[in-house]
């Protein structure tokens, strides 16, 4: 049986973190009842094998899930645009150890996202990230629709690995002291679908509500283009971002 690691630190609170809800306008339509962003990625790249596009990235031996989820976000974003960009395991691990100071200590998601906003990873710096309230399912779904996914963290229940290995959806249950970072790419009325450990994995909305403790929409460089996210006030966000930076 393969081994898998976690590695997400407890959620870090920073009052400067911008919030998704503050940029939603009346022009933003309700999200569709179901969405699978990977359908677009697969169509553009001519493959439907998640194990090839979204590899383990060392998360079987290292607690680098926060960095593996970042790499999966990059592959998803670039894939939507028709470009195949898969970070090598060596690049993911090198960046992870750079941020940890060379030790396998895990990371918190805000530090990873702040680094990505200031430094290019796989040739791109993100424009920004915004916190999404995990309890607001509509905003979670709108964030996936607008920005291709949600970078999230959750407290790990005891049944997590058993359900993953059995290819069964994650369900709520007693929690461990571990945290895990994944990238959500889709949903329907019953499940949220994420990328982790070199594969796709569904989780029930009950699991989501019980376990997910942080979620972020990531705005790629293209978000600066006019009309990128209709109904989401990116102009105001950029102004607020300048204020936070100073």
Regions found by a protein language model. Name each.
Residues 1-246:
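Catalytic-core signature of thiol
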